[in-house]
Amino acid sequence: MINQVYQLVAPRQFDVTYNNVDIYGNHVIVRPLYLSICAADQRYYTGRRDENVLRKKLPMSLVHEAVGEVVFDSKGVFEKGTKVVMVPNTPTEQHHIIAENYLASSYFRSSGYDGFMQDYVVMAHDRIVPLPNDIDLSTISYTELVSVSYHAIQRFERKSIPLKTSFGIWGDGNLGYITAILLRKLYPEAKTYVFGKTDYKLSHFSFVDDIFTVNQIPDDLKIDHAFECVGGKGSQVALQQIVEHISPEGSIALLGVSELPVEVNTRLVLEKGLTLIGSSRSGSKDFEQVVDLYRKYPDIVEKLALLKGHEINVCTMQDIVQAFEMDLSTSWGKTVLKWTI
């Protein structure tokens, strides 16, 4: 079967290429239905990655957040028409200690390997997770980002001290919003505070215990643990504030991505006995557990729906460009592509 793949060939320039798909191989053929644009996709689209990185990784199909529909499974494991969420991380080996998303041998879609902007995607059976029949597929298209937050929380749970009466989340964007939803559900007895820069964005966090602008944090405010969801240049200020307001032996989960090194007040880190926990991406088990949360707590999906900024019906290559350009100017939320091309 001939498949069309829509690749970024240079910043802001897409082209279509073709590949031959063996539908009778040991894989599942999935038709993407809804895709969601990530900040990492935008760094490629706008050319904000290092020039050597762009030269090495392009041309490449973008987007690693998507849901789709099974169109063919030669093994018969999944029925035709089954709605699934696709897992972008693809391991080539298993390790009894190291998680699949930290193995150097794993590859990740839309990061040096083609993402989900294709007519059909060839997926291994363990790289798709079936979804409930009545779920909102448009909202669930950004499940990958939910799984990233969930994975970070699980790492935090395993590595932190038992005292968990209060959490601080630095970052009022998409990742901060999702992390706040999950922390409120997984730790219902704990206080959850969100720290951000924009009143408009902070107004969406009505379900947490309190919100603060980063330049008006009370001096006496203390938290047990923190989640840094800022990224970029703001990571340094966020970490500075976290280290100042976190209690002794607290843990700091680092989720924000910065292209440049950031300074950390190691004197206070040592003095307070703090633990910094790095986290990146997620694996198939995280996706499975997130979908289980959707089933158990439908209100999670309702809150996630408020994160959707725009939904673009993509019928042509120009629609793809329009979607990425619109996403750049979006002040809040995720841009979803209804994939009808």
From Swiss-Prot:
Keywords: Cell wall biogenesis/degradation, Metal-binding, NADP, Oxidoreductase, Teichoic acid biosynthesis, Zinc. The keyword Cell wall biogenesis/degradation applies. Gene3D superfamilies: Medium-chain alcohol dehydrogenases, catalytic domain, NAD(P)-binding Rossmann-like Domain. Pathway: Cell wall biogenesis; poly(ribitol phosphate) teichoic acid biosynthesis. It comes from the Bacteria. Its EC number is 1.1.1.405. Disulfide bonds: none annotated. Zn(2+) binds at C38, H64, E65, E144. Its cofactor is Zn(2+). It catalyses: D-ribitol 5-phosphate + NADP(+) = D-ribulose 5-phosphate + NADPH + H(+). GO terms for biological process: cell wall organization; poly(ribitol phosphate) teichoic acid biosynthetic process. It holds the Pfam family ADH_zinc_N. Catalyzes the NADPH dependent reduction of D-ribulose 5-phosphate to D-ribitol 5-phosphate. This is Ribulose-5-phosphate reductase 2. The lineage of its organism: Bacteria, Bacillati, Bacillota, Bacilli, Bacillales.
